[in-house]
């Protein structure tokens, strides 16, 4: 199918969506007008006043008021804020030159502002008027992970895709459909919110009434708070209409995604566009994993990476050979999702297939380099540090900043202290010092059951006696002794956790120590405890170099 025919189909659907949007407001107006007509007709045709009129008036008011208030009178909060770090033309001439070139190649007006954001995202937004029909100031946001994780060619493709949305002839009507989705969704959400408030208010009234009844020895009422009244029914009614509107409007959005992909392939090249589409889901997963497992690992201990590394450290993760291989596999093994009629984006797998089916195209000259996209940003570490200041919570300013090796060690040491708390409490409650030597002394003195009974354990273990109790207690005591031993070694700087971008952090021990430690722990918690191997090992590790025998 030609681009012209595709554009005509999209324009037709956009016009249908605009018609449906108008129909939404006409439907609301028809409800109000119909109620007014019904009441007027009743008054005109009745020869006398009767109580049914009052009931109808009250019912009509109960229906018309929320429709008028929510659909026509409630103003949605306008979001005039633009989050992120401004990247000015003077500070970032290379990035601006690239953006201007791509916008020009797409045939659209470039942005008045570029902002750096923390998310795996890019987008062009416009301050429009009249539901998007009148253009305004244009903004571009670029996610820091895109600069860190994509090549220049892949970033060119992403930016060309975003500008491509504005190159379509029906972009203004599509703006109307987006505004329509927002307006209809806001109406339904407001009706549900008002219904929820009615339920909460009624529940509070019933609770107060029941408290009054109980204070006077009367039976509490079994009345429930209802479902939210007329607002809930109106929300359900408008939801039926919204489903039709969303189905049509999201179909428009999916068509525009394909059209924007074609713009990207023409400007940045077919292969770069397909590569970017494959890489984005993997990059999003990598960002989430990195933030959870690395950037925020020390937050509980009041620790953060050095300035610029909270977001910038993602590049270290992506540079690890094993992680890079994992991400490459994710890009090749895209999920075979079924299209959702209510989703604004087609499945990535289908978009990639469409792009890869296009004729080979290298893109425009001067674009499509395979250098890291972060090279387009001047002084990237400083910019990423400034982004942290904007994105992180205020309390982050009070946290201690460490380089990655120290951050990993100090974080794991804090976890080791936390893990050792149960056995430290057990020793203290038994009148002993909270040290590994004190626990070894207790084991030698035959107090293993006393210590074990004070450790957290299952109900079955707590009730066990005799041989069964010893079998339950042995792994408890071994874990407790291992926690104390690890804490002692790390606290005395005899062992250190090592950073790995490909694996979880591990306590660095010599081959000899790694072989002897498990055996020594097993011996110490055996039925006939032998603490000598562990005492000897700890003494050797603590002895200065050259003193060990």
Predicted features along the sequence, with ranges:
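Select subsegments of transmembrane alpha-helices in polytopic membrane proteins
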Residues: 17-31
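Juxtamembrane "helix exit" motif at the C-terminal ends of alpha-helical transmembrane segments
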Residues: 28-49, 185-194, 548
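Post-HExxH zinc-binding segment in Zn-dependent metallohydrolases
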Residues: 171, 178-213, 264-267
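Hydrophobic alpha-helical transmembrane segments
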Residues: 37-62, 221-234
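Cytosolic-facing loops and C-terminal tails of multi-pass membrane proteins
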Residues: 2-5, 205-246, 250, 258, ...
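Transmembrane alpha-helices and immediately adjacent membrane-cytoplasm interface residues
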Residues: 50-80
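An active-site-proximal "capping" alpha-helix that borders the catalytic cofactor pocket
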Residues: 100-104, 185, 189, 252-273
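Peri-catalytic and regulatory segments of divalent metal-dependent proteins
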Residues: 73-181, 185
